[in-house]
Design a protein with these regions (language model features):
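Charge-dense, extended regions
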Residues: 308-387
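Conserved catalytic core of two-metal-ion nucleotidyltransferases
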Residues: 135-231, 246
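Hydrophobic, aromatic-enriched interface-forming segments
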Residues: 199-288
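Catalytic metal-binding acidic patch
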Residues: 90-131
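Helical scaffold of the NTase/Pol beta-like nucleotidyltransferase catalytic core
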Residues: 11-92
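Small-residue-rich helix-loop
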Residues: 274-328
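A short acidic (Asp/Glu
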Residues: 88-93, 132-136, 257, 261
Length: 387
């Protein structure tokens, strides 16, 4: 476990400084067309690539979160998320006795203002069977009846059903109530790049605290964040505010969620997330906004002020170019699985025959005949959708 910790700390050292007032470092124009898999951080397009993904918490809270993860078998990538990490409501004077944590570190109590909520984690590992085997030896009490059937059964359920995440909820570690989900690293990678389910990709559209890193996941998540911006732009009018943009992005993963329709989820949840985490949304997406040629801030002088990131009273205006060719390219660059679902919906709308549809899918495939990535250029069907 020490190796990934040292690797994480060494890679974060160059990203920990506040760079909010710096211009985004230019990216190679074809970085999205390169295979999104790396074995070393030195292979990133530049040394600061993806630094927007590293959102700040205080050091004591971060150490407490890492201390919790040290109680588990080694993992390759991990993040903490949800309202237990980044608040979705105004701080209240909660009493310590109201905390769900039996005996948490002081840093967690302070971060959660004395009360707090369960802390959620996603743990990504290259081999779920090995992880569960080690974890069952350490923490058999974390598992349901499936744990009695052995790690091979648990990992089969983990990898083959649903979104590929196996959760153990309501677990106490280091005196802190947590929920943790285990996922195969390849499953996480595919969802970030292709939006197979949007379950994990959607969580990473919102502010999270990354605790352990892996270079190919950093690249994949940067693609995921950029895809979220493009998808939101296709849903937004020519002029809108940054809160409308971030609300649209946040809402992508809630589309079709029955909890939002039947009242088991707060109907103001999206607004609460954006309102209370506006600074982190700016840190996460500002450089990506600046990198897109069809998107700009209406008043660029506002973002030149050194304090704009922290000014929660601002709701900056943005504008996008609705040129059909630009919008068609955004359709073409949507994640593969999600784009195919969009194509299927529009196939029915345009009454396209089955054979014509299959030819169109083959022409728009991301891979060439040799398995390499093709340059993503809009075709006639993308242009019809964008009109």
């Amino acid at each position: 476990l020490l190796l990934p910790i040292r690797r994480l700390q060494s890679t974060q050292a160059s990203t920990s400084s506040d760079s909010s007032n710096q211009s985004p470092q230019s990216l190679p124009s074809d970085w999205e067309d390169e295979p999104p898999s790396l074995s070393e951080f030195t292979g990133l397009p530049h040394k600061d690539f993806g630094k927007n993904q590293h959102l700040e918490t205080n050091e004591e809270f971060k150490r407490s979160l890492r201390g919790i993860l040290r109680e588990f078998p080694p993992m390759t990538y991990a993040f903490a998320y949800g309202s237990g990490v980044f608040p979705q409501s105004d701080a209240t004077a909660s009493l310590v006795t109201q905390s769900p944590h039996p005996n948490p570190p002081e840093a967690i109590l302070k971060w959660q203002k004395g009360g707090g909520k369960m802390i959620d984690f996603i743990l990504a590992t290259r081999y779920t069977s090995h992880f569960h085997s080690l974890n069952l030896n350490r923490h058999k009490d974390h598992y349901s009846f499936l744990g009695k059937m052995g790690s091979s059964v648990v990992s089969h359920v983990n990898d083959k059903y649903g979104a590929g995440v196996y959760f153990n909820p309501y677990i106490t570690v280091n005196g802190t109530l947590i929920k943790y989900g285990v996922v195969n690293l390849e499953t996480l990678h595919r969802d970030l790049v292709n939006w197979d389910t949007l379950y994990l990709a959607g969580r990473l559209h919102k502010p999270v605290k990354i605790l352990f890193e892996e270079p190919s996941i950093r690249v994949a998540n940067q693609r995921n964040l950029l895809s979220a911006v493009r998808c939101a732009l296709l849903l937004l009018p020519p002029n809108f505010t940054e809160k409308q943009l971030y609300s649209t992005i946040t809402g992508l993963s809630y589309q079709g969620d029955p909890r939002m329709d039947y009242g088991s989820e707060n109907p103001k949840k999206i607004n609460n997330i954006v309102t209370h985490q506006i600074r982190n949304f700016r840190l996460l997406y500002h450089d990506l906004i600046m990198s897109l040629p069809n998107l700009s801030y209406t008043d660029t002088s506002a973002i030149s002020k050194p304090t704009w990131l922290d000014d929660t009273t601002l709701d900056l205006k943005l504008q996008q170019d609705l040129d059909p060719s630009r919008r068609a390219n955004m359709v073409r660059r949507l994640p593969k699985s999600f784009r195919e679902k969009v194509y299927f919906l529009y196939r029915r709308k345009f009454n396209i025959s089955g054979r014509e549809y299959q030819d169109m899918l083959e022409a728009s495939a991301d891979e060439d005949a040799k398995g390499g990535l093709k340059k993503q250029s809009a075709g006639p069907f993308d242009r019809r959708i964008a009109e």
